[in-house]
Amino acid sequence: MKEETMEVVCQSGALAGTELPVKEMIDQAFEAMGKAYVPYSGFKVGAALLSAEGTLYQGCNIENAAYTPSNCAERTAFFKAVSQGEKEFKAICIVGGKEGIPTGLTAPCGVCRQVMMEFCDPETFQIILAAEREEYKIFYLKELLPMGFGPKNL
């Protein structure tokens, strides 16, 4: 029987003192990636968003022929969760790759980072970028959106 291990590479001590269902989040993100609608780029992205209450929300990217109306996996997950009444979140897991085959780490775009800033504390919200099911890195939002502008600035 093969022993399963998770290679965890954390930035700034991410995960310290927290309990995240990392394996389940990665599995959910991979499942969501399989649902992506990407007839133009072929680049599939899946996300699994963890609410403060422990509920996981999946999101996938959805492309459109006009490109601008396309939506990223991360925003799909956030909008789904918010439309269900969630407003507080702990973490998100993101996985992506051409034709659904992971090609390294897939980081959120600037628009998705800004949506995260709207609902999440940049000091504590964690972003899991998975290259494979056993290979991932975890960042705090503040690391991916330094000097971010959010609700506290208004």
Residue spans for each PLM region:
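Alpha-helix C-terminal capping segments
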Residues: 50, 79-86
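Short beta-strand scaffold segments in enzyme catalytic cores
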Residues: 42-50
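C-terminal binding/interaction regions
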Residues: 1-35, 84-154
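Compact, glycine-rich, soluble single-domain proteins
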Residues: 61-75
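Short, well-ordered amphipathic alpha-helical segments that serve as non-catalytic structural scaffolds
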Residues: 28-31, 73-81
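Short Gly/Pro-enriched turn/cap motifs at secondary-structure boundaries
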Residues: 38-39
